[in-house]
Regions:
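Accessory, non-ATPase domains that flank or precede helicase/AAA+ motor cores in DNA-metabolism machines
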Residues: 1-243
């Protein structure tokens, strides 16, 4: 019988620490598992944040209950990015996770979702293009940069420095691209955030307009990231409560 491995997970509860469980096999970082939690061993969803490892422990380690989604909705690079944010802001990783990820997101992504978050952006050669005179003609520029065809299901992320700006851009593009365009900022409801997260993961949403928090969405086929007023200080997070 193969020896069990240990994995570290973040549970779907607003707790500021990670937990360790046993798993019968190695799991991909970002996989969703169900684990027994607390004295009552209530089964809740969790996301793996480490590869399987072996380590002697002087305390009881529970086994995971089941593997809900081995493909997961977070790539290992996303988890690595979350860890970097945790170290940079000196905030616990679970707190980073829960401040960035919509509530109950682990509960709405089932094993039927078979798309892999390949982090396409990092595997391609992208060039930075600075638009110096980005005036009232921004809509004309955006329409020029956004291109769709039947063969490619490209996604576009348009970032604005503030919520008001994201609304203005969204309403302008919504008139043109209809259901292909979605808005993501702190003013939309948790239910809407869950819907957008899942649609982006499935590549159903092609254009996302939002503030800086939108960069954490699970894009699969992102083609371009367009940053409006990239010099704006609001892109720099100065508050330890991430938004």
């Amino acid at each position: 019988m193969a020896e069990s491995l240990l994995i570290d997970v973040i549970v779907s509860l607003p707790l500021n620490k990670s937990y360790t469980y046993k798993t019968p096999k190695s799991l991909k970082i970002g996989s969703i598992v169900k684990v027994p939690f607390g004295h009552n061993n209530e089964k809740i969803n969790a996301v793996t944040i480490s590869n399987g490892y072996k380590k002697k422990t002087n305390y009881l380690v529970k086994n995971i209950s089941s593997i809900e989604n081995e493909i997961g909705i977070f790539s290992s690079k996303q988890i690595k990015f979350f860890k970097w944010i945790s170290e940079y802001y000196l905030i616990s990783l679970p707190k980073i996770f829960h401040s960035i990820i919509p509530k109950n997101i682990l509960n709405i992504v089932s094993s039927e979702d078979h798309l892999i978050n390949n982090n396409i952006l990092s595997s391609q050669n992208y060039k930075t293009k600075l638009i110096v005179e980005f005036s009232d003609n921004y809509l004309k520029y955006l329409r020029k940069e956004i291109k769709f065809d039947k063969k490619n299901n490209f996604q576009y992320l348009i970032l604005a420095p503030n919520i008001l700006g994201s609304f203005e851009i969204f309403y302008s593009l919504k008139k043109i691209y209809k259901e292909k365009c979605s808005l993501y900022n702190s003013k939309i409801s948790d239910k809407e955030k869950q819907k957008i997260w899942k649609n982006v993961f499935k590549s159903n949403n092609n254009i996302i307009v939002g503030v800086k928090s939108a960069i954490f969405l699970p894009f699969n086929f992102i083609s371009k990231i367009i940053v409006i007023d990239e010099h704006d200080h609001l892109y720099k997070e100065s508050d330890r409560i991430l938004r």
